């Protein structure tokens, strides 16, 4: 399989994950900011790879598969790191909501694809807003030590907003898929 520029950027995003994990755990005063910077770079590549794939007409099945996987890995790893570091309700609850939603929607998309109705659960604008809120919250939280500061509280608030958007988008996806989830007359 030949690798084009958008796919290479997506692979780079996955390869940046262990780097930001390592930076997060380094015992230096600058490590949180460095980890956050690498995470921000990885988040920016999410926009860049999609833009280039469309602009250069280089969309591929591999890129369509790997892009959402890279996003989910990046967000889940960041949330796990932060839950471990902060160990409080204000971070754990939205993290559980966000990770849980990603599992539910990934399974729903897989199942809908098997039914030939994948377009019913395509990415929406609300999903894009949810992703933006998550990324900004995670960049802020990764950049700061787990202390009760203005920036950490702002990160918690943004993550709660992201969790709310996450639930709202999940409800929209489930409503769109509902006609396919109901039993047919022969299944009753």
Task: Please annotate each region the language model reported.
Residues 66-69, 96-97, 124-127:
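Cytoplasmic-side transmembrane-helix entry/capping segments in multi-pass membrane proteins
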Residues 53, 79-83, 108, 112-113, ...:
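Hydrophobic alpha-helical interface/terminus motif in multipass membrane transporters
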Residues 76, 80, 135-136:
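Hydrophobic alpha-helical transmembrane segments in multi-pass membrane proteins
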Residues 15, 44-51, 69, 73, ...:
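Active-site His/Glu-centered metal-binding helix of metallohydrolases
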Residues 16-62, 78-99, 152-167:
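Membrane-embedded alpha-helical segments that form the functional core of polytopic membrane enzymes
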């Amino acid at each position: 399989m030949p690798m084009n520029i958008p796919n290479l950027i997506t692979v780079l995003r996955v390869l940046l994950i262990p780097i930001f994990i390592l930076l997060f755990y380094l015992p230096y005063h600058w490590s949180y900011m460095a980890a956050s910077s690498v995470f921000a770079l990885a988040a920016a590549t999410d926009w860049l790879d999609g833009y280039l794939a469309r602009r250069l007409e280089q969309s591929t099945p591999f890129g369509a598969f790997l892009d959402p996987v890279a996003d989910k890995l990046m967000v889940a790893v960041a949330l796990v790191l932060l839950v471990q570091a902060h160990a409080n309700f204000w971070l754990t609850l939205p993290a559980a909501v966000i990770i849980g939603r990603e599992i539910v929607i990934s399974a729903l998309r897989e199942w809908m694809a098997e039914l030939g109705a994948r377009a019913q659960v395509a990415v929406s604008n609300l999903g894009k807003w949810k992703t933006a809120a998550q990324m900004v919250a995670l960049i802020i939280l990764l950049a700061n030590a787990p202390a009760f500061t203005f920036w950490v509280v702002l990160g918690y608030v943004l993550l709660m907003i992201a969790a709310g958007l996450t639930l709202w988008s999940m409800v929209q996806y489930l409503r769109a898929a509902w006609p396919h989830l109901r039993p047919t007359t022969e299944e009753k």
